[in-house]
Amino acid sequence: MTKEKAIRLGEQFGIVVDEVDAEIQKELGLQRAEGVAVLEVIGGTMAEGAGIKVRSVIKEIDKVEIKTLADFGWALARATKQCNFTVGTYEPADPGDPVGWGVNFHFVGCKRD
């Protein structure tokens, strides 16, 4: 899975992402440079409906640990073939809301007509 393909899959799901590097690690105050950072959430998408937030770090998709963009791409490709799956995120404290942080699980369900 290339980084470009993983990023494209993320956009189809409804998020603009990048691999957590040293710069993102420092900005978000993370212990390790692991996971995939959510840089933007696209309105009207599955990701927005699941409540995924900007500045969160995706740590797992459907119980598959995410450390790299390749992990993210493979796990998201498998998960979106199903109707329902979960996305585990770590949401660092926002400077304006130091209480609102922690690990969250987002349920992603398919839309039915």
Give the predicted meaning of each segment:
Residues 1-113:
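C-terminal recognition in membrane/secretory proteostasis and scaffolding
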